[in-house]
Amino acid sequence: SRLGKSIIKIEELAKQLKGKLAGPVGAYNGLSMIVKDPEDLERRYLAFLGLEASEYSNQLVEPEYLLRLLLECNTAFGIIANLADDLRNLQRSEIGEVFEYFSSTQVGSSTMPQKRNPWNSEHVKSLWKAMCPRVITFYMDQISEHQRDLTNSASQRFIADYVAGFTMAVSRMKKVVSGLQADTEAMAKTLENAGGRVRGGVLAEPAYILLGEAGVSDGHEIVRKITLECEKTGEPFFTVLKLKKLGVADAETFFENPARYRGLAAEKSKRIAEKYAALMKG
């Protein structure tokens, strides 16, 4: 959802980029001497480049068009880096819920041959770290002293460098996501341990909600005490809850499988993915 909104915004801002053929001070002085309608000539010339004329210009096109586009690119870059970081952490040895494609000839670590490094996700994060600070320069290039100066003659050359880095990160992230594999057993283990020291503690929240629905006024306190008992005895949350015989509706079927406590996660994720996939196709 975050990335989809940003992509749409990038497309909108890219279409708003403007150009100029209005002479060194934007007043069409020279063109007025050789053509009757210099603004028409400007429109036709820029049309070949897929651009419209800037509403106003001096020696430069208004810098905000490009600035806004670059800022939105950096927003998307941050979203991609955030995703890369999440996937990188999920591939840590002690979590291991997902992992990138790993070929039979690939080396994960120079000292630990058994290790798989999430190097693609790490590379995306590294690209973002290198490119993100350049936003400060984009802002600085918004200022053109006394209509025109050459203090951006070097700095703006690195815009292409930034766009190349952003494009590389997008390509690498696409590769990561398309080849991502899941370890469902590790995911189930994470779910089981989600309650910390309380086995099956992830069900504590729905338990006190159901108790409240059943008319139990101190459901939260009851569940809190059950979790303390679970910590002492090592018994799973559902086992102790069942022994209390609190009469929670549907407890037998609901609490036997913690995976049922997922709300609309799957349905909403699929709906959002389908929405933006359709928008990208136009």
For the regions a language model picked out, list residue spans one by one.
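Glycine-rich cofactor/substrate-binding loops
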Residues: S110-G282
